[in-house]
Amino acid sequence: MTHQLHQYHLVDPSPWPLTGAMGSLLLASGLAVWFHTNNTMLLKFGLLTLLLTMFQWWRDIIRESTYQGHHTSGVQKNMRYGMILFITSEVFFFLGFFWALYHVSLVPTPELGAEWPPIGITPLNPMEVPLLNTAVLLSSGATITWSHHTMMKGNKKEATHALMLTIILGAYFTALQLSEYMETPFTIADSVYGSLFFVATGFHGLHVMIGTSFLMVCALRLAKHHFTITHHFGYEAAIWYWHFVDIVWLFLYISVYWWGS
């Protein structure tokens, strides 16, 4: 911050946006190749490139904020605006799935048998695994709030324990969702019901895995005393993201599982 007369962080040139874009392209191309040829080599290479980019990029951001002091109050304020806009974009992303779901379910076409769920589809019981998943995810929302409150009081040990419990619940949710996918009596190719079910819940599951990774990084940083009562935006952003995932699941449970049954 020497000789800097403003509060903004002027970042140094970085290769990570380029490698991240390349990794995303390889990942998307690898998915297409996997679907058509059952070859996962390009998919694995793209995923590895993306993971390495994420690790290096996050490392640089942590160094700039924690050790170099570049994240001033003004920078943190702009980061909050950025996170709010990002979550807003995610809201509209999922809104498209809900729009499609209600578009086809409120007025089913003759091709679907003029009923919802379509003829031949046996929906999952919303009172079984989906209800357990709801309880698990809502519990994780409570534990992450507990972690945040105790951290704000300076009790980092209890905050770490609550955060680890949240991570365990997130991993448990993912495992339950995977077991549910393996037992569903329909596939993604079974009419618009199957495609909407797997795409909507699948993207939500992907967000849960991303959020769990986000929280794992925060747990590591919390253990290394990177966060203080006044300087912990990375942790706060992870909490916002996790609560967003909770809320989306509630709408999915009501719309896909309960309404869809």
From Swiss-Prot:
GO terms for molecular function: cytochrome-c oxidase activity. Residues 1-15, 67-72, 153-155, 224-232 are mitochondrial matrix. The chain crosses the membrane at residues 16-34, 41-66, 73-105, 129-152, 156-183, 191-223, 233-256. Residues 35-40, 106-128, 184-190, 257-261 are mitochondrial intermembrane. Keywords: Membrane, Mitochondrion, Mitochondrion inner membrane, Translocase, Transmembrane, Transmembrane helix. The keyword Thylakoid does not apply. Pfam families: COX3. Its main location: mitochondrion. It is found in: Mitochondrion inner membrane. Belongs to the cytochrome c oxidase subunit 3 family. Component of the cytochrome c oxidase, the last enzyme in the mitochondrial electron transport chain which drives oxidative phosphorylation. The respiratory chain contains 3 multisubunit complexes succinate dehydrogenase (complex II, CII), ubiquinol-cytochrome c oxidoreductase (cytochrome b-c1 complex, complex III, CIII) and cytochrome c oxidase (complex IV, CIV), that cooperate to transfer electrons derived from NADH and succinate to molecular oxygen, creating an electrochemical gradient over the inner membrane that drives transmembrane transport and the ATP synthase. Component of the cytochrome c oxidase (complex IV, CIV), a multisubunit enzyme composed of 14 subunits. The complex is composed of a catalytic core of 3 subunits MT-CO1, MT-CO2 and MT-CO3, encoded in the mitochondrial DNA, and 11 supernumerary subunits COX4I, COX5A, COX5B, COX6A, COX6B, COX6C, COX7A, COX7B, COX7C, COX8 and NDUFA4, which are encoded in the nuclear genome. This is Cytochrome c oxidase subunit 3. The gene is MT-CO3.
